Amino acid sequence: MLGYLLARAGVEVTVLEKHADFFRDFRGDTVHPSTLEVMYELGLLDDFLKLPHQQLSTVTGVFGGYAFRAADFRHLPTHCKFVALMPQWDFLDFLSGKAKEFPGFDVRMQHEAVDLIRVYGRIAGVRAKTPTGTADISADLVIGCDGRHAITRQVANLDVIERGVPIDVLWFRISRTTNDPEQLLGNINYGRALVLINRDQYFQAGLLIRKGSFEEMRAQGLESFRKIIREIAPYLGDRVEELKDWDQIKLLSVQINRLRQWYRPGLLCIGDAAHAMSPAGGVGINLAIQDAVATANLLADPLLTGDVSESTLALVQQRREFPTVVTQQLQVFAHRQLAKVFQNPGPMKAPWQLKAVFGIPGVQRLTARAIGMGVRPEHIKGARPSSERKAACIKSIAVGVGVAAAVVAVSLFGRRRRACATS
């Protein structure tokens, strides 16, 4: 996204991608209304929605057999009043294809960033490993978009603030039938929580487990794992037998952390490279998109004039740190409360507080705004009249209320110049 936006502004951009393609399973597959609004502002929405996807207009959960609607996106002040469920590789292929229409955009596949190039104390490029050897790519600015294990932030010795997370997630696929609920997302029972994301022909499923307990679970055997899934979601029935090997089940070690400082002279980190998020709410990819929009808005002109100082890079962190901190604080709190579910291995009943919270009129709209729009959603520079932006800012005050409501509910149960981005 950032490569597209900078190339669109006239900046020469080289994107380095480690792999030969974008195909990776169990990556973030949710495209939230805030991101879809960015696509609209860029004039890409119609083409984007032609890609295969599912639309999630409401979010429903089941707690111990009690079904409740947790969020309703149908009233959001956006052009798309839903979350689009789409494989991330399709999203990346789409953006890459559109970005290639700009003469200044260059994506180099199978280029893995392994080191940073320094000139007189300033980062001036990237050393990449390629199928034919190493390659040095010079740049006026290196932007690390290479995720939570980013080589850019490691080599630059950027200090990381870690937040303890008591859960991990086991991702797997299980087939889906036409009789399965379309809008159901979360299932809580028997001391476990199971997320089911509708991918049309199958569910992308995630079982939340105590952090570090995966090996213990493996030792108990695959049949025990299948039994757990059956207990939480009985309607899956014999489909759990599709899980025949532990290789079908992928462990995500959940992290929540952020950089104390996102930049060095010649380097900026954004997205997961600057702040690793948990999968809760599927907000990670969308927070990264918001980072990209803010970065392009703030740095396109300085890149064109060649005036990208540390103070200019600091503007990006100043703009995006507040949404990051708020979102992470809420995720940490939510996970700590959700971890309490593990303390009750038997059949569970929905607490009255859960029923009371989601019985309050309008709560589902507020949680939808919190999840779908987030804190301080970004807009393409010049895309909206200032009056609309002001109105949107006023409306966004409700986000805090919505997030708080969601957390309460949970507690109850990154002249032409050159830039280089790594991903």
Protein language model regions, located:
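Glycine-rich FAD pyrophosphate-binding loop
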Residues: L5-R27
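Generic enzyme active-site microenvironment
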Residues: V15-L16, G144, I270
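Active-site-adjacent segment of FAD-dependent monooxygenases/related oxidoreductases
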Residues: H32-K100, I117-Y120
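A conserved beta-strand/loop element that lines the FAD pocket in flavoprotein oxidoreductases
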Residues: K100-V114
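Conserved FAD-binding catalytic core of PHBH/FMO-like flavoproteins
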Residues: V114, G121-D136, L141-V254, R258-Y263
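Glycine-rich phosphate/pyrophosphate-binding beta-alpha loops
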Residues: A193, V254-L259, A274-N286, F322, ...
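FAD-binding beta-loop-beta segment adjacent to the flavin cofactor pocket
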Residues: L252-C269, V325-V326, Q343
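C-terminal helical "tail/cap" subdomain of flavin- and related membrane-associated enzymes
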Residues: N297-S423
